[in-house]
Amino acid sequence: MVLKTVGVAGTLESSDAMITVEPANQGGIVIDISSSVKRQFGRQIEETVLNTIKELGVENANVKVVDKGALNYALIARTKAAVYRAAESNDYKF
């Protein structure tokens, strides 16, 4: 999937996350995580977001995750929504 613009999904409410995905020309997928539980769950958050992005076929992207205690299913849903918005795609594969 080719990213065309910046895609954002989520909120900064408790138990949610805000995911921002933007295109990158090269460098693979770079993930920046901001979370109060990063020391405890940072690796799992990164793994979940990275696997979801790769599953959608994205090869180069800059991703910012602002986590407020989101569970995995919320991270996956928010990441998919942000990627589809960044790709300006309506061809959802749920």
Curated annotation (Swiss-Prot):
Pfam families: ACP. The modification O-(phosphoribosyl dephospho-coenzyme A)serine is found at residue 14. HAMAP family: CitD. Its main location: cytoplasm. InterPro entries: CitD, Mal_deCO2ase/Cit_lyase_ACP. Belongs to the CitD family. Covalent carrier of the coenzyme of citrate lyase. It is found in: Cytoplasm. Oligomer with a subunit composition of (alpha,beta,gamma)6. Keywords: Cytoplasm, Phosphoprotein. Signal peptide: none annotated. This is Citrate lyase acyl carrier protein. One of its GO terms (cellular component) is cytoplasm.
